[in-house]
Structures are given as structure tokens and as C-alpha cells.
Amino acid sequence: MYNIFKGLITALITPFKNNKLDLYAFESILNQQIKHEVDAVLIAGSTGEANSLSFEEYKLLLKTSVEIVNNRMPIISGCSSNNTAYAIELAIASKKIGVDGFMASPPSYVKPTQHGIYKHFEALHEACNLPIMLYSAPTRSGVDFSDETILRLSKLPRILALKDCGVDLERPMRIRAIVKEDFNILTGNDEVVLAFHAQGVIGWISVTSNIAPKICKELLDKWYNNDIQGALEMHQKLLPLYKALFLESNPIPVKYAAHYLGLCENEIRLPLTEASDSAKKQIKKIITSLSIKI
């Protein structure tokens, strides 16, 4: 099975206007990603405020994505839930709508055992024949995959990748040593993208590429083309932006940054709130200093 989980994947924000999906802004955001040739987009993940979407909004967002992208790049949906039956419902809807794969984290809040995590993903795998990427974000979910659980899950035919949002630089090497060769590991942490690539990672699921897809794509292309020094120089230049986009809980800062650049309204759903004045000031300063434009 072809592995779609690789390269630069943008974890897209979800724009709102008057507390409804702003599909006009969403089309503009998607077209920017297509223009700058990112390798795939992730819809309705953490950055996309998936927890705040109704099931109908979720399906509409995916349907709109499929129509706009029109097979020009893979679309990955977020199917995380602490209710296994609902996660399956999200996955089945994703398949029916026409996305290319989905990502899911271990169930949050309920703190399942490793066996429970395995059974959750086994149920997802049996219910839907889309390719699956595991999502490791323990600061959000409260639990994480053990290396042994990743190994067990990687033996299921359609579980093809792991998104690792941590900073344990040994982990990619440990996982690479035990899983099948075509199982991909991607980083979901912008600040350590090159450090993780040096440890065997072959993809970047980025928040920053919402507002700087061209720069992020160039950075990763330099790395893949063995221009290590060029990639390091770009990465160093972007470090202040990475940090600014995590001054407060994601996606609060990136939603404001997108608004500042004219991509969407600065509207975010509770329990998240708008960026503080201090964060806004820092974000504007860094965007200006880097001459980022859409």
C-alpha cells in the first residue's frame, strides 16, 4: 500500500465566522497549500479545533476539502475520540466522503491501558479500510503508545505511520529498529523538525506551514536534497516563529497569525479564547521581521 504519510503535511486551522464554518476562507487557505505544493493536508486535527466541530460540520469540512483539492494532494482526516464507536463513525464518514487516510490519537481522558489502546486501533482498522497514522501527543491525550504497542499496531496492514509530537530524540531510532521498513515516522513538533529527521523521521506535520507553507516546503526540500547547511539556516531563522506560534495553546496563536495575514477571522471556539495582547504583539513582530506574506 502506498504510504501517503510523508513529507510536509500542514495541520490546517479551521476558520470560523459568526460561529459558523467560514468555507470561503477555508478555500483560500487550502489553495495556498496547493499553490506551494505541500505534500498533504490534515483536516480536523488538534490545530483544526476538531473537538469543537459538530459531526455535520466535520463532514462538511471534509467534503469541501475533497472538492477543492480535487486529487491534487492527499487529504488526511482527524478521527480522534475517547469514544471508540464515535471514532469509528468519523473514520467511516471520512472514507465515504473520499479522504485518503486518517489520523487518530489514543483515547484521551479515560486513560486506557496499552491493551485498551491496541484494541481501540484494532477496532478502527477493522471498521474502515483507509490508511491510518497513529498520533502520539501525550500532553493532550494523557496517555501514550509504548514502543511495544507501536510494534503490535504496525503489524496491522493499514497502520502505516506515527506522528510523534514529543521531543525524545531516541524514540524514532528505537521505533525504526523494530517496525517494518515501510512504516513512516513523522514529527509533529516544529521546533525539532530537523533534529528528528536526523534520527530517521521522514515527514513533518506542521502548524507553521499554515502561514508559511512556501518557507516550510523549501526547508524540508533542502534537507531531502542534502543541502543540510541551507536547511539549518532556514530552520534557525524560523525558530522565533515556531516559538511564537506556541506562546499559548495551539491553535490560538496560529489562528491570530492567519488573521493578521488576512487569511481568516480571528475567531476561535470555547473553551479556547483569542490570543492575549502580549502574544499578538510578539506574533506581529516576528511575522514582520521574517517578511511573511500570503
Curated annotation (Swiss-Prot):
Matching entries from InterPro entries are given as: Aldolase_TIM (IPR013785), DapA (IPR005263), DapA-like (IPR002220), Schiff_base-form_aldolases_AS (IPR020625), Schiff_base-form_aldolases_CS (IPR020624)
- Write the record's keywords in alphabetical order, separated by commas: Amino-acid biosynthesis, Cytoplasm, Diaminopimelate biosynthesis, Lyase, Lysine biosynthesis, Schiff base
Which positions does UniProt annotate for pyruvate binding?
A: 47, 205
- Entry EC number(s): 4.3.3.7
Give me any GO biological process, just one.
glyoxylate catabolic process
Pfam families reported in the protein's UniProt record: DHDPS
The positions annotated as site (Part of a proton relay during catalysis) read: 46, 109
Q: Where is the active site?
A: 135, 163
Q: What does this protein do?
A: Catalyzes the condensation of (S)-aspartate-beta-semialdehyde [(S)-ASA] and pyruvate to 4-hydroxy-tetrahydrodipicolinate (HTPA).
Name-wise, this protein is: 4-hydroxy-tetrahydrodipicolinate synthase
Q: Which organism is it from?
A: Rickettsia typhi (strain ATCC VR-144 / Wilmington)
Gene that encodes the chain? dapA
